[in-house]
Amino acid sequence: MMSNLIILPMLLPFVCALILVFTKNKNRISKILSITTMIVNTMISIALLIYVVNHKPITLDFGGWKAPFGIQFLGDSLSLLMVSVSSFVVTLIMAYGFGRGEKRVNRFHLPTFILLLTVGVIGSFLTSDLFNLYVMFEIMLLASFVLVTLGQSVEQLRAAIVYVVLNILGSWLLLLGIGMLYKTVGTLNFSHLAMRLNHMENNQTITMISLVFLVAFSSKAALVIFMWLPKAYAVLNTELAALFAALMTKVGAYALIRFFTLLFDHHPSVTHTLLVFMACITMIIGAFGVIAYKDIKKIAAYQVILSIGFIILGLGSHTISGVNGAIFYLANDIIVKTLLFFVIGSLVYMSGYRNYQYLSGLAKREPFFGVAFVVVIFAIGGVPPFSGFPGKVLIFQGAITNGNYIGLALMIVTSLIAMYSLFRVMFIMYFGDADGEQVQFRPLPIYRKGLLSVLVVVVLAMGIAAPVVLKVTEDATNLNMKEDVFQKNVNTHLKEVNHK
């Protein structure tokens, strides 16, 4: 029974998206249906996650064809944690955008494409074979291509061209890697791949193939290959920028974690050393970006890049603590970046400016923003007891265990830079003088303050209740880093491991 439910987190948004196609210009129906769907989706995802943590992973084989021959979905602690958090933030993002009451909310079927993007994201988390991962990536990317060009301004179209070109190249690389891996190993199912690759250690061909996947997923995660992200995020409206920041790069980071723990861990001196190097470069790029701009939307965009560096540094340590920290920080960052973009978007809404020098006096008029901003800053910086702290401590431990003191030092320094870049915005909000004309701030709608409050509470709760979340991330880490544990819990019928 539970195995059949695993399809629901992907099926419900898909069905809702189809229904919304026929509700054009019916604004109220669109809002109620889409938000209700995502609330139900979140509840189902959390229920499945609780079941998996207390029992064992669940799988669903379509058409009665068991793995490795049929299409399979896998619900383990890692995938369902990502699905639960993603469903939650999409619910808030939809409420944030659709609460405006504009008649334009259904223009271009905006909610439909948000739901289709969600289908691709959740499908990427749940699928248990490589080809379907590619299919889900394409669903996600096609929906995102539409969303990033909705405004039809010259600035948006320029950003969209870079975004589309780099992501198409990444998709080609992913398809190339899938073909190479299938030709070499003869299977695409994760469980079967893990079994066969475990018997192909020190195989240079596999190492080369793993590097193809590394580059492909790096283009999705903005790991070093980041050029598409700042321009694309800066031209999007608040809810779409929050959606992209919360989900798009995180799917790439999730894929890197899944592949370089469960599948490609046979030659860490090459693959994981390269991951650490790329993480360090990404942290440096992000740090320069957050202090180079006065545009608060671009500052937020580079914060996304910086956090990817933190996550991949933990993965690159190739240790239990490092990977555990990476998974925790990944889940946490989905929520924190949603809050960050909500705060930044609200500042732009109230002031009409993206340059933080025009925000003088805002915090005195809206004291609530001071609280929200402090929570964001400390969560990003990893200050205890905020939600960024447990993940960063575990990543620190992984770096120390691995002897990666340069990466550790970079993470500490760039974390401080990330905090500084936001503190200077906050300083202007409290104490700065308006640059030029006196800005007239318009009030933020109550419902948006309510959504910000929900995220603030959740970020605080993740820090205070970290042991609960760590139970989930520890289970995910052990399952994916220990091949024998994975095989005892997933697809136990796969006993034939000889490569034929």
Curated annotation (Swiss-Prot):
GO terms for molecular function: antiporter activity; NADH dehydrogenase (ubiquinone) activity. Keywords: Antiport, Cell membrane, Ion transport, Membrane, Transmembrane, Transmembrane helix, Transport. GO terms for biological process: ATP synthesis coupled electron transport. It is found in: Cell membrane. Pfam families: Proton_antipo_M. The chain crosses the membrane at residues 2-22, 32-52, 78-98, 108-128, 130-150, 161-181, 209-229, 240-260, 273-293, 308-328, 330-350, 368-388, 403-423, 450-470. GO terms for cellular component: plasma membrane. It is a multi-pass membrane protein. It comes from the Bacteria. InterPro entries: CPA3_Na-H_Antiporter_D (IPR050586), NADH_UbQ_OxRdtase (IPR003918), ND/Mrp_TM (IPR001750). May form a heterooligomeric complex that consists of seven subunits: mnhA2, mnhB2, mnhC2, mnhD2, mnhE2, mnhF2 and mnhG2. Belongs to the CPA3 antiporters (TC 2.A.63) subunit D family. PANTHER family: NA(+)_H(+) ANTIPORTER SUBUNIT D1 (PTHR42703:SF1), NADH DEHYDROGENASE (PTHR42703). This is Putative antiporter subunit mnhD2. It comes from Staphylococcus epidermidis (strain ATCC 12228 / FDA PCI 1200). The gene is mnhD2.
